[in-house]
Amino acid sequence: MKIKTLLLCFFTLIIFNCKNKNYQLSKIEGKQIEVTDSIKTNQSFDSIIKPYRDNLTKDMNAVLSFAPQTYSKTDGELNTAIGNLMADIVYDQGNIVFNKRTNKNIDAVLLNHGGIRSIISKGNITTETAFQVMPFENSIVVVALKGKQLDSMMDYLRHAKRAHPVSGMELKLDKNYNITKALVQGKTIDKNKTYYLATNDYLYDGGDRMRFFKPNDSVYYLNYKIRNAMIDYFKKTDTIRPKIDNRFTQTK
């Protein structure tokens, strides 16, 4: 009997000891580890990446064009020299690809003011300049829209009161931000006509509350990054000369 009792106690202890314990987190401690020059370089690892780093540095520092002055997106009110440059690059470079694929032409371009992330400094324009101005992977998209949807776009622009880059169009506002002139390719917008508007994939998907791109007649993904379009443009342009003009203005 004693043996049975001892065995029962033994197995009872085993069962209770095998139960899962519920551990609870009681404290989290953090420690800041600074990355400084005092950290020694791993020479074996560095020797592997050095050729790639040197190659990348060479490519990024390659001189593509020249800027006779510094261009900033804060320089104008409703249109800026750098914004006009960006929109015109998308218009010119994007149309080369679009026309080749569809035998059609881009009518106008709309980008966003916030998409310009850096100034273009006076002096040499390098590949790195393009990455600084346009660090995002945004690609050019061409959307087929009826004229009545362009009216919605113009209405968006007058309410936004920002220098969103445009090309191929002219928008004029009075002192109360009412539209007094809205032209595409120098002509009044035909509500029933199909226009081909170039933008980027972020805006096409509703970025910056630009919801007038959908629905549409059709959409064309060019698979051509805006940054690459900039690089291609800079390569064939010795000196850039963008300026503020009358494409988007307000009568005071």
What is each PLM-predicted segment?
Residues 14-17:
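C-terminal motif of bacterial Sec signal peptides marking the signal peptidase cleavage site
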Residues 21-36, 84-87, 91-109, 113-252:
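Feature captures C-terminal
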Residues 36-38, 67-68:
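Membrane metalloprotein/metal-transporter helix-bundle signature
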Residues 39-64:
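Post-signal-peptide N-terminal segment of Sec-exported extracytoplasmic proteins
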Residues 59-77, 210-214:
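Acidic/histidine-rich, surface-exposed loop or edge segments in extracytoplasmic proteins
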